[in-house]
Design a protein with these regions (language model features):
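Surface-exposed polar/charged interaction patches
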Residues: 18, 22-25, 75, 79, ...
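Polyanionic (Asp/Glu-rich) segments that form extended negatively charged tracts
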Residues: 1-102, 106
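Generic intrinsically disordered, low-complexity segments enriched for polar/acidic and small residues
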Residues: 5, 18-19, 26, 46, ...
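Short linear sequence motifs
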Residues: 14, 42, 113-114, 165
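Intrinsically disordered, low-complexity N-proximal targeting/linker segments that flank membranes
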Residues: 125-181
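Charged substrate- and nucleic-acid-binding regions of tRNA-handling and nucleotidyl-transfer enzymes
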Residues: 1, 90-96, 107-146
Length: 181
């Protein structure tokens, strides 16, 4: 194809807003600022916020954002069996993965990769993202970023709670539905 898919463009725009929020104009931005993680909200992915970012800043973010999304797509293919963007049922999960994988150290850390795989499937199979998707997006992004800051010592409460809810939602995906009973 000679043009980007609408799914890719939307994810790219969301990630550009997140990068702008964390960078505050600093090209060497970090996703490890606990206060910024805590104050993150869905407004940074909305049109009004994105239209206020100067074009020269966006130009500086695009390569980094594309790299994060490409890493996330590779992760989804290699670790989760997702072959095409159309197979992602909740596209903002791709943005969460893309955000995490902006950090090269996290992308190369096997513990972070294992954690992200557990988070991905737990979020899907627990029904975490089935309603109030924007709130679920921010809640998951904040908790994932917080839990991987120090992956070896993190208690991973959020992800453990998701794991405990896997296949328990009678209206979404309980054992009987999955086993087609």
């Amino acid at each position: 194809q000679k043009e980007l898919s609408a799914t890719y463009i939307k994810a790219l725009m969301n990630l550009l807003g997140i990068i702008d929020y964390f960078s505050e104009g600093d090209p060497g931005f970090s996703l490890r600022d606990a206060e910024k993680i805590q104050n993150l909200n869905v407004k940074v992915t909305k049109r009004e916020y994105l239209l206020q970012i100067p074009s020269e800043k966006i130009y500086g973010y695009v390569e980094v954002a594309c790299q994060g999304l490409d890493r996330a797509a590779l992760f989804l293919q290699m670790r989760c069996g997702i072959r095409k963007l159309g197979e992602i049922h909740y596209n903002l999960m791709w943005v969460i993965l893309g955000t995490v994988f902006l950090d090269e150290a996290w992308f190369e850390d096997s513990e972070v990769l294992d954690y992200m795989e557990v988070w991905y499937w737990s979020a899907i199979l627990s029904g975490e993202v089935k309603i109030e998707q924007n709130r679920a997006f921010i809640r998951n992004l904040q908790n994932v970023l917080s839990e991987i800051q120090n992956i070896k010592e993190s208690d991973k409460k959020f992800t453990k709670a998701l794991c405990n809810n896997v296949l328990t939602d009678k209206k979404f995906a309980d054992r009987d539905i999955v086993l087609m009973k």
